[in-house]
């Protein structure tokens, strides 16, 4: 099998040295992606295209699909390579391939040549087109908007019959731009923004702020691995997980309600910037869109960026949610995002849309930055290639109950302001208010003879916290969903 790779047009307008560098990098990327899929693959670069040849015909579809997902490729031509003697031989070979496709259809012939010949491209188009028109009575020539375009490429003494054209990802080859660190949550926005930077030639590493439990972390790892495996597997990247529950707990205890959202984002940027500096990464990537939530106003974004000198890229800044979801659907992350949990108790009730720098800094003076230093120092870094193996491990499950048994103790793990606004009142059961950010440290002090059922408004945080406790060896926990 043989494929002709056509370059993304922006590559072709670069200077000679830059163009050659981009083509060399793209050639290497193609080799890296195809090497695990097919043996004895030959990838040869030329000035205006790249050739891919392989012997295993059974893997043709697999190779074609992989090529369509490599950034830097405008389109792929699947071709049959044959020698020819003259224009009539070209016509006969074309007729043999296209006869069935052209029945009852309008068509035109398009020819591209490389090398020296005794004929022009237009002469071949006219000769072959006229022959097809005469030998296929039901076919008709239409030069504008035909139903079938017969694409031929002539390279010296070889005829390339194009079996099909397949669109690529476009963009720049990964590795032509510098590395970035994507703050990924598993939702619609962060997945799409990560893809957009990969498509622009960046090697994208991932930083995940874990707010509770392995289930969410595994879900986000699967999104990151999917994006890497589908669009960026030509390069090795890192996945960095930071346990941010202690930071959230400190914010909920020490920071005024209206300032929590901005302070939390500032802490995330601080932490991510340190990770980026550790690995020599040039910029952060977020999925923020202007005005989408309270922390994403211009005033608040400026304050968030002010805590670090690291460049923060926001490729979705002017996109609306509907467009972002459509992009997620196109790249295949929509289903992941739909099932990704949102956390109750993390978002403030009355967030400010126009934070004041002096007020934010005053609130942050109450924050113990030793906690932030500790979680960054304890961040877990792994090669993203190891995620697939790790995800195959069994995830501990936890039982969800709708009614309470005699003797059950309900742990209300919502934040204190939620507990005050909407108290959980149960006539026949004991209720203990224990915010989720204190649960991990305080649960061991409870009477372990009793059975504890965890409650929160949406049931997401309670399930994640119950999973965490089960992983720590506590079997006396359930999730309460009345």
Curated annotation (Swiss-Prot):
Keywords: ATP-binding, Cytoplasm, Disulfide bond, Nucleotide-binding, Redox-active center, RNA-binding, Thiamine biosynthesis, Transferase, tRNA-binding
Annotated ranges, domain THUMP: 61-165
Organism superkingdom: Bacteria
Pathway info: Cofactor biosynthesis; thiamine diphosphate biosynthesis
Pfam family, one: ThiI
GO biological process: one example: thiamine biosynthetic process
Active site as annotated: 456
Primary localisation category: cytoplasm
Compartments where located: Cytoplasm
Broad class of enzyme this protein falls into: transferase
Catalytic activity: [ThiI sulfur-carrier protein]-S-sulfanyl-L-cysteine + a uridine in tRNA + 2 reduced [2Fe-2S]-[ferredoxin] + ATP + H(+) = [ThiI sulfur-carrier protein]-L-cysteine + a 4-thiouridine in tRNA + 2 oxidized [2Fe-2S]-[ferredoxin] + AMP + diphosphate; [ThiS sulfur-carrier protein]-C-terminal Gly-Gly-AMP + S-sulfanyl-L-cysteinyl-[cysteine desulfurase] + AH2 = [ThiS sulfur-carrier protein]-C-terminal-Gly-aminoethanethioate + L-cysteinyl-[cysteine desulfurase] + A + AMP + 2 H(+)
Keyword Zinc attached: no
Record-annotated disulphide pairs: 344-456
GO CC field: cytosol
Disulfide bond as UniProt keyword: yes
Binding site for ATP: 183-184, 265, 287, 296
GO molecular function, one term: tRNA binding
EC number: 2.8.1.4
Gene3D superfamilies assigned: 3.30.2130.30, HUPs (3.40.50.620), Rhodanese-like domain (3.40.250.10)
Domain Rhodanese: from-to ranges: 404-482
Family stated for the protein in its record: Belongs to the ThiI family.
Known role: Catalyzes the ATP-dependent transfer of a sulfur to tRNA to produce 4-thiouridine in position 8 of tRNAs, which functions as a near-UV photosensor. Also catalyzes the transfer of sulfur to the sulfur carrier protein ThiS, forming ThiS-thiocarboxylate. This is a step in the synthesis of thiazole, in the thiamine biosynthesis pathway. The sulfur is donated as persulfide by IscS.
The protein's name: tRNA sulfurtransferase
């Amino acid at each position: 099998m043989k494929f002709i790779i056509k370059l993304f047009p922006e590559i072709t307008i670069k200077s000679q040295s830059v163009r050659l560098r981009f083509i060399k990098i793209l050639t290497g990327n193609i080799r890296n992606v195809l090497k695990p899929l097919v043996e004895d693959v030959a990838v040869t670069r030329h000035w205006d295209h790249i050739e891919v040849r392989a012997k295993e015909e059974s893997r043709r579809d697999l190779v074609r699909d992989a090529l369509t997902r490599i950034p830097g490729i405008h389109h792929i031509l699947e071709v049959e390579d044959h020698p020819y003697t003259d224009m009539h031989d070209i016509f006969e070979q074309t007729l043999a391939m296209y006869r069935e496709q052209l029945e009852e259809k309008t068509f035109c012939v398009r020819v591209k040549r490389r090398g020296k010949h005794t004929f022009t491209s237009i002469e071949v188009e006219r000769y072959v087109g006229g022959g097809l028109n005469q030998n296929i009575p039901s076919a008709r020539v239409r030069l504008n908007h035909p139903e079938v375009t017969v694409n031929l490429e002539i390279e010296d003494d070889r005829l390339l019959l194009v079996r099909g054209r397949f669109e690529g990802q476009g963009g720049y080859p990964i590795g032509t731009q510098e590395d970035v660190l994507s703050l990924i949550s598993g939702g619609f926005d962060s997945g799409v923004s990560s893809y957009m930077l990969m498509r622009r030639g960046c090697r994208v590493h991932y930083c995940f702020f874990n707010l509770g439990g392995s289930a969410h972390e595994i879900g986000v790892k699967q999104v990151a691995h999917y994006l890497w495996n589908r669009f960026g597997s030509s390069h090795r990247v890192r996945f960095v997980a930071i346990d941010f529950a202690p930071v959230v707990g400190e914010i909920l205890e020490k920071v005024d309600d209206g300032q929590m959202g901005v302070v939390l984002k500032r802490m995330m940027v601080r932490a991510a910037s340190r990770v980026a500096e550790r690995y020599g990464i040039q910029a952060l990537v977020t999925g923020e869109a202007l005005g989408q939530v309270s922390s994403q106003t211009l005033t608040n974004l400026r304050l968030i960026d002010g805590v670090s000198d690291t460049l923060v890229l926001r490729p979705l800044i002017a996109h609306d949610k509907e467009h972002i979801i459509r992009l997620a659907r196109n790249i295949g992350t929509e289903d992941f995002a739909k099932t990704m949990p949102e956390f109750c108790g993390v978002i403030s009730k009355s967030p400010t849309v126009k934070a004041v720098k002096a007020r934010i800094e005053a609130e942050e003076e109450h924050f113990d930055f030793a906690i932030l230093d500790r979680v960054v120092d304890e961040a877990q870094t792994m090669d993203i290639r190891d995620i697939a193996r790790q995800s195959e491990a069994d995830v501990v499950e936890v039982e969800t109950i709708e009614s309470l048994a005699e003797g059950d103790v309900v742990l209300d793990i919502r934040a204190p302001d939620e507990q005050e606004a909407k108290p959980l009142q149960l006539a026949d059961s004991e209720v203990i208010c224990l915010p989720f950010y204190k649960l991990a440290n305080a649960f061991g002090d409870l009477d372990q003879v009793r059975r504890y059922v965890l409650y929160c408004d949406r049931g997401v945080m309670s399930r994640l916290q119950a999973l965490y406790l089960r992983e720590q060896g506590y079997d006396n926990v359930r999730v309460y969903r009345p």
